């Protein structure tokens, strides 16, 4: 890991981006969304069809208690291996990626994609760890998540970190620079 970032617990990483994919089928919401609406995920399945998609790389929490959850997990790991072997990804080595997301109200959220040092993370309420949870952690969701990661050749985190930056020295300077970007339809 890059020593310059040690005190942050947040580092540049080898970031995988899909290349030559239909982004309407590739991108899906975080796995912890629509947990009580399996019909939402069935509709996503219909939309994606056989196309490469992050749907094949995540375990929607709506399926955590499915009787065939172990089969889902094996399929996720197989999809990861296949996508890597088939060259589905473009690799951005040792990178941070600046992102902008437009919310439904029109506001733009700005952020960085990178790697979090999980040794610096603690989800215990009241923790003083460098990186800590801002909302409650549902403990019974951890074991299936750990099973997905056990044999996973890639990581697909879905967390958003909030930073304590009252001087606005991290994200705000990036918003002033012009970038080439991909706009999703």
Q: What are the residue ranges of the model-derived segments?
A:
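Conserved small/polar residues in nucleotide/adenosyl-binding loops
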Residues: 180-184
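N-terminal extension/subdomain marker
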Residues: 1-177
């Amino acid at each position: 890991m890059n020593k310059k970032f040690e005190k942050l617990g947040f580092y540049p990483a080898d970031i995988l981006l899909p290349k030559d994919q239909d982004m309407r089928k590739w991108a899906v919401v975080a796995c912890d969304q629509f947990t009580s609406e399996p019909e939402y995920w069935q509709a996503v399945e219909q939309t994606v069809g056989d196309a490469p998609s992050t749907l094949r790389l995540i375990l929607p929490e709506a399926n955590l208690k499915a009787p065939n959850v172990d089969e889902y997990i094996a399929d996720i790991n197989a999809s990861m291996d296949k996508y890597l072997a088939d060259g589905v990804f473009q690799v951005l080595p040792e990178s941070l990626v600046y992102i902008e997301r437009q919310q439904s109200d029109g506001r733009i959220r700005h952020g960085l994609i990178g790697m979090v040092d999980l040794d610096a993370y603690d989800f215990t309420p009241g923790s003083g760890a460098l990186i800590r949870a801002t909302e409650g952690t549902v403990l019974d969701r951890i074991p299936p998540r750990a099973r997905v990661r056990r044999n996973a050749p890639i990581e697909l985190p879905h967390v958003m970190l909030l930073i304590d930056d009252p001087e606005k020295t991290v994200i705000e300077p990036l918003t002033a620079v012009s970038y080439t970007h991909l706009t999703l339809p």
